[in-house]
Amino acid sequence: LVPYISLSFNPLSIFFSFLVFLIGLTTNIYVLNYFKNEANESLFIFWLNCFILSMVVLVLAQNFFTLFLGWELIGLSSFFLINFWNIRRGTLKSSFKAFTFNLISDLCLLSALCCFYLESNTTDISTFLFLIFNNFSASFYLTTGTILLVICASIKSVQVGGHLWLPDSMEAPVPASSLIHSATLVSAG
């Protein structure tokens, strides 16, 4: 089991990649006016584009490792975007709250992917789905993995119970809030 990055270019993943890039482009254009004369504008743009690239990696993922890598990079980028104005009093607290909830989500995803691997003995998403749909049986690993995946998605997409980090993360600059809390992150969930 050697981790490697594998991307899938099919019509659905290309469409969602285009959607992520389009939302990212409009956010980048907005940032140029929002941060006029801001000293750390380039740092913010760096983390913003890391977030966008992470979303694209997540959408194009062909195997569990690439999916998890994109998922983790989204969490890391979110942390730095929320904590961008770290001179504000509540910013560090809110960024760690978001980080903690995302860490719980990450552990659920990692556990779910391990369950799926134990069930199918593959890390390729297409092969996994083919095996599950053609040889479906409600096994312990599949059921546990599915439940963990629902918990993971609920936290990341701020559903009931996993939404507690969202209001505090509004400490981030407006462009970060708009990107993180728009359909891009909800789509990831």
Residue ranges, per PLM feature:
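...captures the hydrophobic TM-helix bundle architecture rather than a specific catalytic motif
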Residues: 1-189
